[in-house]
Amino acid sequence: MNRFLLRHPLVRTLVELRGNTRACVYTEPMWGLSMNLCLPYASVFMLSFGMSDVQVGIIASIYMFSQTVFAFLSGAIVDRYGRRFSTAFFDFLAWSVPCLIWASSQGFWFFAVAALFNGMMKITTVAWDCLLVEDAPRDKITHIYSWVIIAA
């Protein structure tokens, strides 16, 4: 069984990963699982503050709009500040700051500001994707993305 597994191209890719690619793939479950477990309850959390369905929809729209703006700017920002720094810094701004705002939230405007900050995750996404594939062998990129999808 062990020999069979090690001959499988996906398993072989996972074992042979090095550098930034290995760090990105190996740590993906820590992010993917936690976000997929808690984000669906964000709207329920907002409703518990007495917000209406329309207000929750506006917050979701603000979040989507800020993602669009930051996606447009992300390439220039990542090139300017580098992939690792951009990943670390904007990950903090996109997730830690909104979590602190959500935890101390008093209503609609708190959630709106948190949604604006949370949209910065597009910068992190671009930087992380660059880290994931920049040193990876071209023939392994499909397998690497397969592991990311499996992990999250």
Identify what each model region corresponds to.
Residues I123-A136:
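Intracellular juxtamembrane helix-capping segments at the cytosolic ends
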Residues L6-S66:
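Helix-loop boundary and gating motifs at the non-cytosolic
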Residues Y63-F70, M121, A151:
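MFS transmembrane alpha-helix packing/gate-lining sites
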Residues P29, P98, W109-T124:
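Hydrophobic core of transmembrane alpha-helices in multi-pass small-molecule transporters
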Residues F85-L100:
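Structural signature of the two symmetry-related core transmembrane helices
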Residues F70-R83:
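Helix-to-loop junctions at the C-terminal end of transmembrane segments
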Residues G82, S104-Q106:
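Helix-breaking motifs and short loop linkers at transmembrane-helix boundaries and internal kinks
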